């Protein structure tokens, strides 16, 4: 756990016509969302607040993202290196290289967001959207079982493999 991570930024529409930007980091070993931050702007502050939630890997870790401007920024790259991660970037314009976190974003929206909010009438404030995201991450990590994890939740799976 904690050695191979993927990250991306997705966004949710707000009632005032703006966006809630959501930065997430997923552990490829456990499936757990290990970092999450929201912002009214897609900027370096969002990316850095997300990184600040990470623990350094026990051995050299890999941190994979797309080639978005947040991730190619030297400040971001330096912070990753300082944390003990080697940076890995998707091929330009190839979303399939980051499919695991892209898939999570889609799952979050389909399971949690779209059923609760009519697409024709986005009625979320930024605070509502931030709360919504944190609730889903908690649900996903602690309650949502996954077949590939032996029908355990990501947190149960992490506990199981770290006890052995």
Q: Across the structure, where does each feature detected by a protein language model lie?
A:
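Charged DNA-binding/catalytic regions of mobile-element recombinases
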Residues: 1-164
């Amino acid at each position: 756990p904690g050695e191979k991570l993927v990250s991306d930024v997705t966004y949710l529409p707000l009632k005032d016509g703006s966006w809630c930007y959501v930065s997430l980091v997923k552990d490829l070993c456990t499936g757990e969302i290990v970092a999450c931050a929201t912002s009214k702007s897609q900027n370096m502050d969002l990316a850095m607040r997300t990184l600040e939630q990470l623990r350094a890997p026990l051995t050299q870790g890999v941190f994979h993202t797309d080639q978005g401007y947040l991730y190619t920024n030297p400040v971001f790259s330096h912070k990753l290196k300082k944390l003990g991660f080697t940076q890995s970037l998707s091929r330009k314009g190839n979303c399939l290289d980051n499919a695991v976190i892209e898939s999570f974003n889609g799952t979050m929206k389909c399971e949690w967001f779209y059923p609760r909010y009519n697409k024709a009438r986005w009625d979320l404030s930024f605070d509502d959207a931030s709360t919504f995201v944190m609730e889903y991450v908690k649900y996903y990590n602690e309650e949502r079982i996954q077949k590939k994890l032996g029908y355990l939740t990501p947190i149960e799976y992490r506990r199981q493999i770290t006890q052995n």
